[in-house]
């Protein structure tokens, strides 16, 4: 009887450990979902992003409208500047 009691206790402890490990694995996923929701809400509150249209001056790809990149429009030194253009 004593061996059976010890076996039941060990099984209970192992089951409890398994439940704790599985529940910890879900926390990062929940955190990522909340972070995404917060970023999405923030973007919606800011409104549409203003972008630089084609053939307008730019300083980096991030400011150009979708499907455009910031390119040097004078070769070879690029001292005159950059413009948004197709890739």
From Swiss-Prot:
Propeptide: 24-49
Taxonomic superkingdom: Eukaryota
Pfam families from the UniProt entry: Conotoxin
Subcellular localization, as worded in the UniProt entry: Secreted
Annotated signal peptide: 1-23
Cellular component annotations (GO), alphabetically ordered: extracellular region
Changes after translation: Contains 4 disulfide bonds.
Tissues in which the protein is found: Expressed by the venom duct.
Free-text comment on this protein's domains from its UniProt entry: The cysteine framework is XV (C-C-CC-C-C-C-C).
Family per record: Belongs to the conotoxin O2 superfamily.
Designated name of the protein: Conotoxin Bt15a
Source organism (scientific name): Conus betulinus
């Amino acid at each position: 009887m004593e061996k059976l009691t010890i076996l039941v206790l060990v099984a209970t402890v192992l089951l409890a450990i398994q439940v704790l490990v599985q529940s910890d694995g879900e926390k990062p996923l929940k955190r990522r979902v909340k972070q995404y929701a917060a970023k999405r809400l923030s973007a919606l509150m800011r409104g549409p992003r203003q972008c630089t249209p084609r053939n307008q001056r730019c300083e980096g790809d991030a400011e150009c409208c979708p499907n455009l990149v910031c390119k040097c429009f004078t070769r070879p030194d690029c001292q005159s500047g950059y413009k948004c253009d197709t890739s």
